[in-house]
UniProtKB/Swiss-Prot annotation:
Similarity comment: Belongs to the TACO1 family.
Native species: Opitutus terrae (strain DSM 11246 / JCM 15787 / PB90-1)
Stored InterPro entries: Integrase-like_N, TACO1_YebC-like_2nd/3rd_dom, TACO1_YebC_N, Transcrip_reg_TACO1-like, Transcrip_reg_TACO1-like_dom3, YebC-like
Annotated compartments: Cytoplasm
Keywords of the record: Cytoplasm, DNA-binding, Transcription, Transcription regulation
Name used for this protein in its record: Probable transcriptional regulatory protein Oter_1471
Gene Ontology cellular component terms for the protein in this record: cytosol
Length: 248
């Protein structure tokens, strides 16, 4: 969940979304539609779409749902017009939050997000209030067993990635958002399957959290935001010691 703890966040989100397949499919449908609208319906020429189609396959999303989402994006089928919006706010303990939303109703989305922030001890902030604490970049999390560090660095950096970070869990590849499609395509051609591939907000400064009650409040705010239908992703800059959280 913590903004800095990338792999734990992926693991936690997988556990949450596995229990809410309907919302997973809804989110994927929106993302696929937007990707097809922006870059066309051919995944061979649209790396963002290809990445999402792989996500849909891994989530066992029905092929008919995927096909409809693509055709809505290309205009072959009528559909609701969605808009991508980013909201910023502060949670308990001064933790910064960025919430990515895909919605057909900006007013509803803003009201729901504001309500959740207030309910869990935070507040919605103005644009730019917290985003300076994050790096807006492409991010790929790749299990270490799939490839060696040297081989990954060669593939990723040749494709335009800015950095490859190694940890016990695996590798994190970062790139400029404009290089995301090219890097995604290069990793795919190498046969790599990232645990996560997304345009993310990566914290450049973090807020250490050692108090169990504060950690729970931050976690609950994160989860409550994630539960909202219009919310696609939630990023935060907390640095929670996971040993203080209750066992899940």
């Amino acid at each position: 969940m913590a903004g800095h703890n990338k792999w734990s966040k992926v693991k936690r989100l997988k556990a949450v979304t596995d229990a809410r397949k309907g919302k997973v499919f809804s989110r994927l449908s929106r993302d696929i539609t937007l990707a097809a609208k922006a870059g066309g319906g051919d995944p061979n020429g649209n790396a963002r779409l290809r990445t999402l189609l792989l996500k849909a396959r891994d989530a066992n999303m029905p092929a008919d749902n995927v096909d409809r989402a693509v055709k809505k994006g290309t205009g072959e089928l009528p559909g609701v017009v969605f808009e991508e919006i980013t909201y910023e706010g502060y949670g308990p303990g001064g933790v910064a939050f960025i919430v990515k939303v895909t919605t057909d109703n900006k007013q509803r989305a803003a009201q729901e997000i504001r309500s959740v922030f207030l309910r869990w001890g935070g507040n919605l902030a103005t644009t730019g209030a917290v985003s300076f604490q994050f790096l807006h970049a492409g991010q790929f999390l790749i299990p270490g067993a799939q490839i060696s560090e040297d081989a990954l660095m060669e593939v990723a950096l040749d494709a335009g990635a800015d950095d490859v970070i190694t940890s016990e869990q695996g590798y994190e590849v970062r790139c400029n958002i404009h290089a995301f499609d090219k890097v995604a395509q290069a990793l795919d051609q190498k046969g790599l399957k990232p645990d996560s591939a997304m345009i993310a907000y990566l914290p450049t400064t973090t807020v250490p959290v050692t108090d169990p009650q504060l950690a729970q409040s931050i976690t609950r705010l994160h989860d409550a935001l994630d539960e909202l239908d219009d919310v696609q992703d939630v990023f935060s800059n907390d640095e929670i010691d996971e040993s203080i959280l209750p066992a899940s």
